[in-house]
Amino acid sequence: QSRSMAGIMSNSITDAMRANVTEARNGAYNGSTCDVSGEPGGSLADSDITAWVSSLKRAIGQSACGTVLCQAGQCDITVQWDDSRASAGSSSHLVTTRVQL
């Protein structure tokens, strides 16, 4: 179920990036974060990333983190989380989705 949610949540940030495509292509969404505190007065991209990671944590669990890397309009979106409770040990998972903007 977590893997499916990671794919769905990747689509969520992709939609936000397409709505702000110029900034996305310029790298405004690039980075990796587990932080949901956000910065007051930040950019639309910052707000989108904060909302996305908050949604990841609600859907997948508090260990969820997100990474976006866009270069020349091609973006890799990665969702990573630890599912050790479900697998009775350390179990780090990641799902990467590649999209063209």
Language model regions located:
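Flexible, low-complexity segments enriched in proline/glycine/serine and punctuated by aromatic residues
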Residues: 1-101
